[in-house]
Regions:
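Helix-coil boundary and interhelical linker segments in multi-pass alpha-helical membrane proteins
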Residues: 2-5, 131-137, 270-284, 324-342, ...
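Transmembrane helix-loop-helix hairpins at membrane boundaries of multipass inner-membrane proteins
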Residues: 1-10, 24-121, 197-198, 202-206
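Central hydrophobic cores of alpha-helical transmembrane segments in multi-pass inner-membrane proteins
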Residues: 12-27, 41-54, 94-109, 126-127, ...
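C-terminal ends of transmembrane helices
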Residues: 22-32, 101-113, 155-164, 233-247, ...
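Alpha-helical multi-pass transmembrane bundles of energy-transducing inner-membrane proteins
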Residues: 31-33, 118-213, 217, 302-369
Length: 462
């Protein structure tokens, strides 16, 4: 079905290398620290190099995939193949996974954690699953790789998470299992209803163009996908797992999940839901709009109330996914482009912020912003990076987040049914500015407060 050219084999190897390195590290307690670091660096660095190379040679053709590879799995009788490829929707997110995965890996390599070989192995498994998710053309493996990436997240929170890690891990498991089951039911219903003979997205698309599903079937299937994927993206009111999960998760897991894995649901709606079920998408349009606005306005106000840095970042991440859902609700190419740009920019900025928040904790021994102040005098470089990442996250002009949100606003304004949404959605910009500027001011400027003063004077803050 496809040729085994150099680039398609590179795509396959980018998934297999972190998987194999992770498996080796899992049983690598006998390795010394230096060897473990170099082997881990290979596992995290190789996918980044491949992702950059594939992005450089990528040719964007509507509906077409680059670097296609199709391998038998033993399940050909039911239409399941390991079918890989990248199109204009998946390529940016595949590159995002490579960048954030490498950053999280480097940070993890230099972190002091117990059983570091297991910790690094789980991160590599997570990265392999993420890359496989975005590279899969077969919807069976699209779902399989996502679940494969989720499992290490639960384990890492349960072992290396914060003081309430077991409760948080249980809550995440319940929510994300529910979302995964609903999305699985939606995918199965899509396959059965279509009557197609393959799980290949390309064949499903071709078949449904020639034989569109009825309005009722599209409504039901899209509803399953919307709420299944929505739970995985923390769509209101199914959001409560995300902020606590990110606050409790070890830094590497928080970077990969908030920065990349969380984008799975939105990617699924862009790649599957809207193109294959257009009538169902239109039917659920009011729900998408109102729930997205709830993400922006209600979660935005909750974000303002936070005093813990990581909880603030977690709620902020949930809030900004509302803009991505609004972009999908435009059902336009401009809106889809804005969503992709926002997902890419948000993934980079939120991953950096979670890493920097851990750096702040290591220097202050607290995450309570009310117990900080004046840190810029002791850590000016940390302050500069945190403020820059915060400004990017809240959508300051010049950063990628701004252009993503701006493009979504343009798409909303161009369509009469969504034009009214521009004003309430714009209130979220003010909300973002309030919590972002306040956090930067409380942490890095002003006078040190409380016990923070003694730690500054005693030199505990590096």
């Amino acid at each position: 079905m496809s040729t085994f050219d150099q680039n398609s084999l590179l795509l396959l190897s980018s998934i297999l290398v972190p998987l194999m390195v992770g498996a080796f590290l899992l049983f690598g307690a006998f390795l010394n620290k230096a060897t473990r670091c170099w082997i881990s660096a290979l596992g995290f660095g190789y996918p980044l190099v491949v992702a950059v190379l594939l992005a450089c040679f990528f040719e964007a053709n509507p509906g077409a995939y680059n670097y296609e590879l199709c391998l038998p799995t033993g399940l050909q009788s039911i239409g399941i193949y390991l079918h890989l490829g990248l199109n204009a929707v998946s390529m940016p997110l595949f590159l995002l996974a490579g960048i954030v995965g490498f950053s999280a890996g480097v940070y993890a390599i230099f972190s002091q954690v117990d059983r570091s070989h297991v910790y690094l192995a789980l991160l590599l498994f997570m990265l392999s699953g993420l890359l496989g998710t975005f590279a899969s053309v077969d919807i069976f493996f699209f779902y399989f790789f996502h679940e494969f990436a989720l499992i290490p997240t639960f384990i890492m929170i349960g072992i290396w998470g914060g003081s309430n890690r077991r409760i948080v891990a249980l809550q995440m498991t319940i929510y994300l299992t529910l979302g995964a089951m609903l999305s699985l039911l939606g995918l199965i219903a899509l396959y059965i209803s279509s009557g197609a003979q393959s799980f290949s997205l390309l064949e499903l698309r071709s078949y449904l163009v020639a034989n569109p599903l009825s309005q009722t079937v599209q409504n039901n299937v899209f509803g399953l996908l919307l709420f299944g994927f929505g739970i995985l993206v923390s769509l209101f009111p199914f959001h409560s797992w995300a902020p606590k999960g990110y606050a409790s998760a070890p830094t590497g897991a928080a970077m990969l999940h908030a920065g990349v894995l969380k984008k799975f649901g939105l990617y699924g709606l862009l790649q599957l839901g809207w193109p294959l079920l257009p009538l169902g998408a239109i039917h659920w349009f009011p729900w998408i709009i109102w729930l997205a606005l709830a993400n922006i306005l209600i979660i935005g106000l909750i974000t303002i109330a936070q005093r813990d840095v990581k909880l603030m970042l977690g709620y902020s991440s949930v809030m900004h996914m509302g803009y991505a859902f609004l972009g999908i609700a435009t059902f336009s190419v401009v809106g889809a482009g804005g969503v992709l740009l926002l997902l890419l920019a948000h993934g980079l900025s939120v991953a950096l912020l979670f890493m920097l928040s851990t750096c702040i904790y290591q220097r202050t021994l607290t995450l309570n912003m009310q117990h900080m102040g004046g840190l810029a005098t002791q850590a000016p470089i940390l302050g500069a990076f945190f403020i820059a990442a915060t400004m990017a996250s809240i959508g300051l002009p010049g950063f990628g987040n701004f252009w993503g949100e701006f493009t979504i606003f343009v798409a909303l304004a161009e369509s009469a049914p969504t034009r009214w949404v521009v004003l309430p959605a714009a209130i979220g910009i003010i909300i973002s500015a309030i919590y972002g500027l306040r956090a930067s001011a409380n942490i890095f400027f002003g006078q040190p407060r409380g016990g923070f003063t003694e730690r500054l004077q005693s030199g505990l803050i590096r």
